[in-house]
Swiss-Prot record:
Binds 1 nickel ion per subunit. The keyword Ion transport does not apply. Its cofactor is Ni(2+). This is Putative nickel-responsive regulator. Transcriptional regulator. The keyword Cell membrane does not apply. Gene3D superfamilies: ACT-like. Chain A, domain 2, Met repressor-like. Ni(2+) binds at H78, H89, H91, C97. One of its GO terms (biological process) is response to nickel cation. It comes from Syntrophus aciditrophicus (strain SB). Keywords: DNA-binding, Metal-binding, Nickel, Transcription, Transcription regulation. Transmembrane segments: none annotated.
């Protein structure tokens, strides 16, 4: 027998219509899938605020011609070696590089790393994508 539990949800008609548009826009096949995803997202946010072990990816684009930029990036990465699991460097064009840093550890430390990398002069764009480490069903 499945561990799936059915329960009812009462919603205002306007909210339900907005939710159904959300489901269609995100290509969910049904409301249950969308609700499960939203619940997981909220539980994941809770993990990040409670300093539980988490995982994620930091991505940033930079001009590799910027003076001393690579040394600054490497210095910061070495300062946070305990949470960095892997890095991937991609040449986007002659001037721009994309770097993806896979991280796992304390969310406060990961956020500090992300902020430090994004704050370097020459980094054009950066973002932190959060995930869990498999604790959420």
């Amino acid at each position: 027998m499945s561990d799936i539990v059915r329960f009812g949800v009462s919603l205002d008609n306007t909210l339900l219509k907005q939710f159904d548009r959300f489901i269609k826009d995100r290509n969910y096949t049904n409301r249950s899938e969308a609700i499960r995803d939203l619940i997981r997202q909220e539980l994941l946010k809770k993990e990040w605020t409670e300093d539980q072990e988490v995982a994620g990816a930091i991505t940033y684009i930079y001009d590799h011609h910027q003076r001393d930029l690579l040394n600054k990036i490497i210095d910061i990465q070495h300062d946070f070696h305990d949470v960095i699991k892997s890095t991937q460097h991609i040449h986007l064009d002659h001037d721009n590089c994309l770097e993806i840093v896979a991280v796992k550890g304390n969310p406060t430390t990961i956020s500090k790393l992300s902020n430090a990398l994004k704050a370097i002069k020459g980094v054009r764009h950066g973002s932190l994508s959060i995930s869990g480490v498999g604790q959420i069903a």
